[in-house]
Amino acid sequence: DNILELIDEIKKEKNIEVILGYNLGSSNEIKDYEKTFFINLGYLRFIKQIDIFLSSYVVYDFPSTLNKIYINHDIYDTPMVDLEKEKNLIKALNKCDYIFLSSEIVILSLQKKMNCYSENQIKSKKPQLINTGYLKLDHVYEKLKINKLEEDSILLAPTLSTTLKDFNLDEYLDPIIKELLNNTNFKIIYRPHPGDKANLNKNLILNSINDKYKNNKNFKIDFDTSYLDSYKKSKILITDFSGTAYTYA
């Protein structure tokens, strides 16, 4: 819901009309908002007559506009994709006019990758990399000040299960949950990556984990679009290389 707060701020500007497009992964938080529509990201290129395109997703097909803006959600140089997909990622980012990043460290990391792949014949106008600070952190800080719900809970929040499979927690989730439930007095909150919830095959696995532990009063699976309640309730976070570690800290 932090992106919606940004949209509300933009709407305060005169003579700006904001239209929101969403896909399956973002439908729950956006579909009931005013002036929204569902779209497959591959069809973005058919959208015409807009002045600014703003996205917190990496997209590979862009609408026709002179101002294409991508807001990166990482606070540090966490991996974005597997190495074999990195070339296509940089190619897509090079289509942007502006990329909003959270720190100089992230800017230097992205510049290094862009320079690396420019040597491999990916040639296009370079986007402007702008240090905006960590916009999401402002949102989290304000929300957490309102109400603290801290419980004796452990939050288990891995990254997207299909990213860098040799290093993420995916195959260890079930034994970790079992070990924590059997050997601690903590409540366990398992929060899957939103991208896994949107993946139909992975969703079946998530539901099977939920079915396995749902009768345990100390287990909860969190599919909410906002992670703030789980942040508030937990004293400990278990994750892998997900950027959520920095947000949580």
Per-range role (PLM):
Residues 1-2, 27, 60-61, 75-77, ...:
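Short acidic, S/G/P-rich loop/turn micro-motifs used as interaction or catalytic elements
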Residues 58-72, 79, 224-249:
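A donor-sugar binding/catalytic signature common to diverse glycosyltransferases
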Residues 30-36, 75-82, 164-167, 214-220, ...:
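Short, flexible loop segments at the rims of nucleotide/cofactor-binding pockets, characterized by
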Residues 50-58, 142-155, 230, 235-239:
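Short, surface-exposed amphipathic charged segments that create phosphate/polyanion-binding patches used
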Residues 17-33, 181-223:
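Catalytic donor nucleotide-activated moiety binding site of glycosyltransferases and closely related
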Residues 22, 54-57, 71-72, 102-103, ...:
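Short His-Asn-centered micro-motif
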Residues 2-10, 135-208:
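Conserved catalytic-core segment of nucleotide-activated headgroup transferases in glycan assembly
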Residues 1-141:
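Active-site and donor-binding regions of nucleotide-sugar-utilizing enzymes
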